[in-house]
Amino acid sequence: MKPFNELGICILNGYIFVFVYFDFNFNYIINEIIITIYSVEI
């Protein structure tokens, strides 16, 4: 059971890291997508 718990903690930490990373970069990513869409349309 211990290896499973350690794996679960690693996965949880990974999800937290991804969530925080995207939370910080979400606005930038959306702006890049909008700029790209406008550039393609123009």
Curated annotation (Swiss-Prot):
It comes from Dictyostelium discoideum. The chain crosses the membrane at residues 7-29. It comes from the Eukaryota. It is found in: Membrane. It is a single-pass membrane protein. Its main location: membrane. One of its GO terms (cellular component) is membrane. Keywords: Membrane, Transmembrane, Transmembrane helix. This is Putative uncharacterized transmembrane protein DDB_G0284993.
